[in-house]
């Protein structure tokens, strides 16, 4: 069954709301990509509104980490997810979202991109 992002058919009181118009394709949604740390890199290309393409990153073990002190950006290996404010269960499953703290070869880094929307993991190195 499709994910529908339209208004609910019920009011807060429980009364049924009758539709003024039918459901439209523009109101459909998709499940989240939930990018995981894995040895294999897996991307999914999805057609979105306006016949545009969106690259969803499903699995990866690399991130582009920017070192602010040296002004250098490097492609490094991600080992695991240390903290994720989006969902506490994402830490155990190694799911990367924007704002997640990841462990890399260079040290701890904070994800600044949206991997499920952008198709790449960009991060900033944290100073300890």
From Swiss-Prot:
Q: Keyword Zinc: yes or no?
A: no
Keywords linked to the UniProt accession: Ribonucleoprotein, Ribosomal protein
Q: Molecular function terms in GO for this entry? A: structural constituent of ribosome
Q: Name one GO cellular component term.
A: ribosome
Look up the domain of life of the source.
Archaea
Record InterPro entries: Ribosomal_eS8, Ribosomal_eS8_CS, Ribosomal_protein_eS8_arc, Ribosomal_Se8/biogenesis_NSA2
Does the UniProt entry include the keyword Glycosyltransferase?
Answer: no
A GO biological process held by the record: translation
Its subunit composition reads: Part of the 30S ribosomal subunit.
Q: Which family does it belong to?
A: Belongs to the eukaryotic ribosomal protein eS8 family.
Protein name according to UniProt: Small ribosomal subunit protein eS8
Organism annotation: Methanococcus maripaludis (strain DSM 14266 / JCM 13030 / NBRC 101832 / S2 / LL)
């Amino acid at each position: 069954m499709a994910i529908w992002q339209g208004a609910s058919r019920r009011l807060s009181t429980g009364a049924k709301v009758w539709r003024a118009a039918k459901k439209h394709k523009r109101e459909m949604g998709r499940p989240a990509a939930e990018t995981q740390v894995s040895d294999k890199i897996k991307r999914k290309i999805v057609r979105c509104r306006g016949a545009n393409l969106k690259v969803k990153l499903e699995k990866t073990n690399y991130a582009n980490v920017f070192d602010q002190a040296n002004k250098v950006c490097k492609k490094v290996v991600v080992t695991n997810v240390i903290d994720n404010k989006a969902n506490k269960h994402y830490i155990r499953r190694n799911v990367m979202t924007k704002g997640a703290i990841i462990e890399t070869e260079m040290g701890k880094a904070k994800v600044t991109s949206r991997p499920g929307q952008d198709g790449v993991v960009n991060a900033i190195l944290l100073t300890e």
